[in-house]
A protein has these predicted regions:
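Membrane-proximal intracellular helices of multi-pass ion channels
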Residues: 1-445
Length: 445
């Protein structure tokens, strides 16, 4: 009897499942956007433009090659909004939500994947956390839509209901897509509402709330104002977020927006400090801002929001850990510390790896686009920071880019959204060494 060799079935890691899930949804979204019914002119959208839009929506970026309000039909806008919602929550979280609603049990493998997707500290309680994520998301998005309703209904009638819901979800998911462009005025974002305190404040609040992370909101809802009982990660996120909101606002107020009334300057300064992390809306002409302000926005874009949130970027915790490690080095301390707790050395290593990967993609992408399009490097750096950090801000070059440059941005948006460590672990797997090589010192600095 002939015995055939038995092949071991390949098991995908949690990180590979996350990337495959995003890629599959991205492709389906692109195909839906290619249908003539998706556009107002009932035309077939080229695949590369549909893929760019689908990737931008799913990766909650906001960069567009076609104006969302004037080019896409209600069907197309609905597809974009669905992609934004899936991308904001995460493909795995949405899949788990459907499984829970259908009464199916979540396997151990699925729980492990959900843990990685939500940046949860442990697998226990992951199903309960998923339910909390869905509830808090619905609460903020519906509350935001209700607050935006009077403004949009006053300007657009019954269509304002759709506008309020769309912009609320887009803001909380840190997407930056808007429906306010027309044939005569495309890619205007929220500039017409720059002097509207209600709309700008609500949108800014939704952006910040979405970017804090669901674990942070779990601490806030559980312990209320008892800050000392929060987990260290939540404390770091809240303090770092406050730091990254207040200081840029003061800079913009003092050095960028120096004309107009105090209220106008406050609204402009506040909103432009919020939106780079990582929403993509704007209430000012970004191309008209000074070079130092644009450079500051690039830094804010790269830093991004917080882990386990709807935002992208390197994350506030990465920035905070690198600062803490630098401070420990200055003081000749062995360990970086936060709030009376020692930071694990693997966290410092991961932070340095993520920062290095994002900066490499940021510069390399800009170099390719600048070479292909013959554009100034500074403009391309702004564009690639916006893409890899899934922000959506632009100095106006996105619609004019060629297919190669659009492909670069698609890759940056996708890589930026799935996360630095997710990409690394999916590509290289985990193979712990059973032996260690001899150690030798090397001079640094």
């Amino acid at each position: 009897m002939i015995q055939y060799p038995r092949y071991k079935r390949h098991r995908f890691s949690s990180f590979q499942v996350i990337i495959a899930g995003f890629a599959a949804v991205d492709l389906v979204g692109a195909l839906l956007l290619m249908f003539p019914i998706a556009t107002q002119q009932r035309c077939v959208t080229p695949f590369h433009e549909a893929l760019f839009t689908s990737t931008s929506a799913l990766c909650v970026t906001g960069l567009v090659v076609q104006d969302t309000g004037s080019y896409w039909s209600v069907f197309g806008q609905s597809v974009i909004l669905l992609l934004i919602q899936i991308g904001g929550l995460g493909v795995i979280t949405v899949g788990a939500a459907f499984a829970l609603l259908s009464g199916r049990k979540i396997s151990l493998k699925q729980r492990s994947t959900m843990q990685e997707a939500t940046a949860a500290p442990q697998m226990g309680g992951i199903v309960r956390l998923t339910g909390f994520i869905l509830r808090i998301t619905a609460l903020f998005e519906l509350a935001g839509a209700a607050l935006l309703l009077p403004t949009f209904c006053a300007d657009y009638g019954l269509r304002g209901i759709w506008y309020a819901l769309f912009h609320s979800i887009s803001a909380f998911c840190n997407a930056g897509f808007d429906l306010l462009g027309t044939e005569g005025a495309k890619f205007v974002s929220l500039t017409q509402y720059a002097d509207n305190p209600l709309l700008t404040t609500v949108i800014a609040a939704l952006i910040v709330f979405g970017g804090l992370g669901f674990l942070t909101w779990e601490d806030i809802c559980t312990y209320r104002l008892d800050f000392h009982r929060y987990r260290m990660q939540s404390k770091v996120i809240l303090v770092t977020t406050a730091f990254l909101l207040v200081l840029p606002s003061l800079y913009f107020y003092c050095f960028e927006f120096t004309a107009g009334s105090a209220r106008q300057r406050i609204l402009l300064s506040m909103f432009q400090s919020v939106t780079p992390r990582t929403a993509g809306f704007n209430t000012a002409d970004l191309a008209a801002m000074g070079s130092p302000s644009q450079a500051l926005m690039v830094v804010l874009m790269l830093l991004g929001g917080s882990p386990g949130s709807t935002a992208g970027g390197m994350k506030t915790t990465t920035f905070a850990v690198l600062l803490a490690n630098m401070w420990a080095t200055f003081r000749r301390r062995e360990d970086a510390e936060f709030f009376g707790r020692r930071i694990d050395s693997s966290a410092v290593k991961n932070a340095a790896t993520i920062a290095g990967m994002y900066l490499t993609l940021f510069f390399l992408g800009a170099f390719v686009i600048a070479t292909a399009e013959q554009l100034p490097m500074s403009v391309c750096l702004y564009e690639t920071a916006s893409a890899v950090a899934t922000v959506g801000l632009t100095l106006g070059i996105t619609p004019q880019l060629g297919i190669l440059s659009q492909g670069v941005l698609i890759a940056l948006m996708f890589l930026g959204r799935v996360g630095g460590l997710t990409l690394i672990y999916a590509a290289f797997g985990s193979s712990p060494a059973h032996s260690r090589l001899p150690q030798e010192k090397i001079a640094i600095g």
